[in-house]
Amino acid sequence: MGSLLSNGGFNTLLIDLRNNGYSENVSDFFYLGQMEYNDVLGAYDWLIEERGYLPSSIGLVGLSTGSLSAIYALDESDIGAMWLDSAITDFPLVVRNELGRLGYPEFLASPTITMGSRMTGVDITERDALDVASRIGDRNIYLVHGSDDSRISTQHSENFHNIAINANTNSTLWLIDGGGHIDGIWAHTIDYQNRLVTFFTNSLS
């Protein structure tokens, strides 16, 4: 993803969220963006305060579970635009789908989420990505999702897109026919890069 953007003429900052890659391991848990979005905001603040970027010239890319951190960061900033690929936008839906995929009854979703919050010490439903979709305003967003994604259903991107559209946000949804999870960047690289670069070129100032 970084190379697609840099080859398209964009300065690109790649970050590892807490407990990932080269970043510090501060706990044994992943907080589904509820804490990690602060890492994105830290990078955003650094670009503004140390490098002199304008908020409206900064865009976000979120992939899969990382989309939650991007969405929550967008909600608490003036970031100019956001690109999401195979996004999670409804955590309870993820839990229900995963339970069903594993052969367990979906009514276990609620107690599973409650137990997750108790284990992590963080309310993992405190922020709601679908609520954010109604508050994006005139900023542009672009959602990409493979129609055959077996891990994160297209319903996530479709619901987020529909809420954003109803709130008069300029939202685009690209459903890739037959695509899997984060599959478009590999299966349709040229088209993917063209869409990505065009989107940010037109969306950032």
Summary of predicted features, one role per range:
Residues 72-122:
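Hydrolase active-site cap/lid region
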Residues 164-182:
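Catalytic histidine neighborhood in serine/cysteine hydrolases
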Residues 153-163:
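Short alpha-helix in the alpha/beta-hydrolase fold that links the catalytic acid
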Residues 187-205:
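Catalytic active-site module of serine/aspartate enzymes centered on a nucleophile-bearing elbow/loop
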Residues 2-24:
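Conserved alpha/beta-hydrolase
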Residues 136-137, 142-145, 149:
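Short beta-strand/loop motif that positions the catalytic acidic residue
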Residues 51-63:
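Alpha/beta-hydrolase fold nucleophile elbow
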Residues 30-51:
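Alpha/beta-hydrolase active-site loop
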